[in-house]
Amino acid sequence: MKTILIIVIIALVGLAAFGVVYNFAITPPSTSTVTSSATVNGLTLTISGEITRPGTYVINEGATMIDLITAAGGTTSNADYLAWNADFKCVNKGSYYISPIYDNSNTCSLEPIKKANLNADTAETLQAVAGFTKTVANAIVSYRAGAAFTCLEDMKLVSGVGQATYISTRDKVTLRSAEA
């Protein structure tokens, strides 16, 4: 009887230890970095896309896009450096996206995604982007006459560009030309 009781106790302890180890192994690491000084006067920013550790971060006020990218561990090798502005001043509670150079679908892509330049291309070129109508392409050209696009999220400030259009087109546009 004592032998059975000892075996049961050992089995229960083993199961408990396994449960703790298993729970620790499947818990993803935290993606947010919070410093005590940043929580008082910091910006809460979310970054996604071609970033090493996408997530929400609290960083110092006055932070630029490069500060946010650095806090998130940098970009992946597939990040399109022409689609973000390193000097852009982040806005509190802002959500930022780093688009890819190559398509991330299940197919192997050998050619970079053809992208339209929000700050330079004509309405006709912008209209060729799947997701942009003639009206939206003209609205983009009108918008940039008053202010250049400084981040991809600025597209949402254009009349006719909502969240759905932004999401469907953000990988197909850039802020600068490769020659710039």
Task: Enumerate the language-model features and the residues they cover.
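Ser/Thr/Pro/Gly-biased, low-complexity, turn-/loop-rich segments
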Residues: M1-S159, Q163-A180
